[in-house]
Amino acid sequence: MNNIKLPVLYCPFPSAINQHCEAAYQHTLEWVRSFNLLEELACQKLFAANFHGLMARVYPNASLKALEILTDFMYLGTIVDDAYEKAGTSKQPDLLEPEQARLLNILKGAELTDVDTPVALAWGDFVQRLHQFPYVTSEWMLYFVKHMEDYFQAARWEALNYSQGIMPDLVTYIKMRPLVFGIYPFFDMILIADGIALPPEVIECPAVKQMGLAANNAMAWANDIFSFKRDIKEGMVHNLLLVLEHEYQISLEEALKRAVELYEAEVQNFIELSLQLPSFEAGIDTNLERYVLALRFWMSGYLDWIMKSRRYGKFSEYQLL
């Protein structure tokens, strides 16, 4: 495994970094500490993963106010996601549902209480601030809530698999991975970060949804390609390479080759779909073009970040060509 060489993944999209990256980082670091979400050593380890750098790359045009809440959301989501993985590997997946239900109720308007956890209190602060953005309409909230519900349900599925030692088959994994990955709520945030107004007929357009799925899949496969070493070390079975290896009884090297092919196919699919989108009307088409550009920044920014993040090991450890 140590000698496996990963190729440089294909991504023909522009890259940029938000000028407010450092300020957003300082804000979120204090925000996480203010809610006592982590012990100090765990906090330092988490921020070493540079998720603030990820947010600055995938939302390069966001204002400072927007980037702050996006970075808060990213770090809080990571804390929650790591807790869900731990619940699964410690064979306690039933712990997830009550907390998830509480977070969803807060998102839908429930008041905070004295018995809420630090995560719930931080989430409540996030939700309150979220409503201050003009593009957070009732329609937008419906999509955001639905995508959070989908993520929570998928996280329970993943945790149950971990607790029971279940390796999903390839078809099931490909179906569930976009939901477990948790990117759709961040795609919703593009409208906040870039000030884009898209009516429901555009958001629900099959071609637009397929384009979003292609972007989601490409990043999920990139994640699995770069994280397989950590996943093997930690006993995680939810990884495309490991699923391919198990499904087809092939070597890890061959699984890597097939995973890269799946990644490249999704990038090409995204390109083709983005060039074949239907026309709506002038103003809407302009905003849709901006949305496509934002997805391109997501794909390139995510790849830039994951190649450098300490969360998955140093770039040099993988001996990239």
What are these regions (language model features)?
Residues 1-321:
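Alpha-helical, largely C-terminal catalytic domains
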